[in-house]
């Protein structure tokens, strides 16, 4: 579904920026990581954490409007109010937890984990009349050697023509394609 001239754009990033890599790896490495020593306490704690992770409901622990920025990272953003200029891009930062991992074995026998998300992003008037957006937007896939538990989504709406001044709602439905679970976020915003 595409309405009007408003275009959704979705960016999913995990382990992409050098600054995020080292922090992420410290949480994501499993027992098969090549190191000079193994840490049985870490492995036991990680195994216990993943058992709890598997019981979590898929939902965002953070879901806020953010300023567009060249700096993207897990927990790295500059918060934006819900008041926008008519020609401003509307960007939501969401940090989900409780998503699934699908184990995949490559032809060479290498074990990887797939994380896969899609999103519906619909801008409406306050009365629910759709103005623009899209559905079933590929939000990205991540293939990793580890069951990553930290990632973020930047869900953006851009538009060709300035939005009329007024009050709106943005409805986000994010689906974890591995588990089939979805979470919904509705954000009010004002264009001045």
Annotate each language-model stretch with its function:
Residues 1-30:
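Secretory targeting signatures
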């Amino acid at each position: 579904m595409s309405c009007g001239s408003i275009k959704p754009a979705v960016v999913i990033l995990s382990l992409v920026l050098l600054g995020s890599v080292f922090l992420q790896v410290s949480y994501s490495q499993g027992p098969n990581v090549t190191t000079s020593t193994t840490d049985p306490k870490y492995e036991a704690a990680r195994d216990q954490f993943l058992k709890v992770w598997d019981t979590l409901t898929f939902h965002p622990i953070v879901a806020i409007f953010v300023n567009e920025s060249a700096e993207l990272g897990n927990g790295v953003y500059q918060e934006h109010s819900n008041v926008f200029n008519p020609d401003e891009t509307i960007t939501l930062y969401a940090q989900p937890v409780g998503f699934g991992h699908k184990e995949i074995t490559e032809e060479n026998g290498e074990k990887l984990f797939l994380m896969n998300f899609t999103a519906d992003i619909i801008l409406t008037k306050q009365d629910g009349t759709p103005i623009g957006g899209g559905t079933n937007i590929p939000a990205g896939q991540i293939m990793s050697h580890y069951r990553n538990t930290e990632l973020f989504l930047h869900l953006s709406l851009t538009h060709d023509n300035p939005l009329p001044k007024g009050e709106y709602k943005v409805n986000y439905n994010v689906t974890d394609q591995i588990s089939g679970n979805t979470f919904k976020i509705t954000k009010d915003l004002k264009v001045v």
